[in-house]
């Protein structure tokens, strides 16, 4: 082979090798940048930091509120389990949609959770500290969120959970959709002068419950009704005695419809309240203004809390 031709072949081979090395180097840099972009760190409500190399793919939700938020944040393929309440139509707004996820967990059972090999566990701050710690002791990624007590808390919770699962933009979209829904509901209700706003008391099976920090207070404000229990000024939350409720003399009694144990039939609870001798002198009972609204809305601390505003306004002003 002539020397000149041999040199041309060598030069061509070296050029090809150089191109391959450049391409490989670019691919490596691209992969490193991609991995760097995918990695992120979040801090939960207790100040605990969680580091993720990539978005979690086996997420476990241990409460109905995070069940409802999570299903709108990520595809079902990234959810390993929901809470057991997700299948109860009395308290869950996503019963049918939740069927796309096969497993259910009890937030108190560390072993059952561990068996599902989760890469992220969402758990409320009211769970016992020892349960949370037992999960962390298993080297599991546990994100403890603050239980919402207002509409702003719900917005914040959605945003924080969005960050935790690596879907910050999706979380913002959910908050925007929630606020747009709330505006439509408020536009439907219209403006009701304060002096014409109905005074109500929300009753449980064991009586009225006083709580100065409860999401229901915000529901009332947006529905333009007055929660008569806010006129009380107790030192701590608790059951309000019958005499105090009678003194408040509400115009409406409100009940949450959820027969969670087969012994709390909503219609029967209405009748029991209307026939309770202790409340016969209240305007609510005298005028038979005892209404039941869906518990899955009025007890919600997810985006579905907006539905409670509409339910309450409809019950109080449309009946």
Walk through the language-model features, giving the residues of each.
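Extracytoplasmic/secreted envelope proteins and their assembly/folding machinery
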Residues: 53-56, 63, 67-68, 95, ...
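A short, structured surface patch at a secondary-structure boundary
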Residues: 61-116, 120-125, 228
